[in-house]
Amino acid sequence: MTSRLQVIQGDITQLSVDAIVNAANASLMGGGGVDGAIHRAAGPALLDACKLIRQQQGECQTGHAVITPAGKLSAKAVIHTVGPVWRGGEHQEAELLEEAYRNCLLLAEANHFRSIAFPAISTGVYGYPRAQAAEIAVRTVSDFITRYALPEQVYFVCYDEETARLYARLLTQQGDDPA
């Protein structure tokens, strides 16, 4: 049986999955890192959809997630989530990061998505230590997929080889084949 969890090193904007997750900022207006890359690749339709969400419900709070069409991307949808800014680990960062992953998965399940791709949420400009963030990501996603049939396939998309090895090691430790 193939694992429902896989690690990919590469560009999340190039994946043909039901949903890609955007590590967004609260404004949903694009930014640096993966957020900027997703907005550039998706084109202006993504920004328009994000503006509409802001008009309807305001900013996206830390740990929350919202869904938009994917614009020019191969994915069906983009799920935007706001991870926590690392402030030393004493400000509920772990709980908020777990909540961000779980809320993305709940949106994917509610929309009957079979596949979802996650970047390493909060590990860029938000400064979350990669190893700790990866442990939370793998644990949260693993717990979720034991309880829900969807999504059937979850990809951890890592920009660099070091992060990909970190995720692969964590999946191997829990008995999953990350390839």
From Swiss-Prot:
The active site is at D35. GO terms for biological process: purine nucleoside metabolic process. Signal peptide: none annotated. The keyword Hydrolase applies. It catalyses: 3''-O-acetyl-ADP-D-ribose + H2O = ADP-D-ribose + acetate + H(+); 2''-O-acetyl-ADP-D-ribose + H2O = ADP-D-ribose + acetate + H(+). The keyword Lyase does not apply. Keywords: Hydrolase. Its EC number is 3.1.1.106. Residues 1-175 form the Macro domain. GO terms for molecular function: O-acetyl-ADP-ribose deacetylase activity; purine nucleoside binding; ribonuclease inhibitor activity. Homodimer. Interacts with RNase III. Belongs to the MacroD-type family. YmdB subfamily. Deacetylates O-acetyl-ADP ribose to yield ADP-ribose and free acetate. Down-regulates ribonuclease 3 (RNase III) activity. Acts by interacting directly with the region of the ribonuclease that is required for dimerization/activation. HAMAP family: YmdB. This is O-acetyl-ADP-ribose deacetylase. It comes from Salmonella newport (strain SL254). The lineage of its organism: Bacteria, Pseudomonadati, Pseudomonadota, Gammaproteobacteria, Enterobacterales.
